Amino acid sequence: MNGSTYAQNYEFSRIAIELALGRGGDQAVVKDNDKISYYGGKSQQMEKSTRVKARVKAHALREFIGSHEDVVIMGHKITDIDSFGAAVGVWRAARILDKKAHIVLGDINGSIRQWVNLFLNDKEYPEDMFVTHEQARKIVDHDTVVVVVDTNRPSMTECSEILNQTRTIVVLDHHRQSSEVIKNAVLSYIEPYASSACEMIAEILQYFADDIRLKGKEADCIYAGIIIDTNN
C-alpha cells in the first residue's frame, strides 16, 4: 500500500504474498513502502514438506538449468557445511545436464576447508569448480542461472552483486523468509520445515534426473550438511 503508482502497489502486494507463504501461510502481511507488518500466525505451523512439492521444484529447476549454458551457485557469507554441501549438490545437477557450473566461495573458513580441499586435490573435478567473487562477476551475465542456497536474504549471499547481473535467479532455502527478499527470482523454494538446505537438495536430486549419480565426496558433503545443521 501507499506506493507511488499502481505498478508499485502491485509489486508491494506480490512481495507481501511471497512473505506470507514463506512464513507458513497463516499470517496476513502488509507492506507499506519500506515497512512490513505481520498479523496473526499464533497457531503452530504443521509440516507441509511433501514429495510432490520437491518433485515439482526439481522439474522446474531442471528446466531452468537445461535452458541455459552457465550456472553459478552461491550460499551465504561465512560458508558452513550445509551451505557448501547444498551448493555441491546443485553443481552436480548442472553437470548431469552438461552445463558449465561454478560455486562462488569467499574466505574459506576452517569448518569447510577440508571439504574444499577434497575437491581441489581430485583431478576428476575441474579447476573452475570454485570461483572467487571477482571471477563470478566476470562470468555472470543476463543468460546465466544464479542459484542461491541456504539463505533467502540478498545481503547474506556470498556475492550479492551478481544478483543484479542476471535475469534468472533460483532460491533454495530452509530458513523462514524475512522482510528482506531476493527480488525477481524465477523459482523460489523456501521450506522452513526442512532441517537443512542439504536435506532439500537431497530430495530435489531424487527427482531431478533418473540417471543422476553422486560421487562419494559429493554424497558425504550433503550428508554432513544434513547431520550438522540438524543438530544445530
Labelled PLM ranges:
Residues 1-12:
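Catalytic strand-loop-helix junctions within cyclic-nucleotide turnover domains
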Residues 7, 15, 19-22, 93-95, ...:
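Internal hydrophobic scaffold segments of catalytic domains
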Residues 10-11, 18, 88, 199:
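Short alpha-helical basic/polar micro-motif
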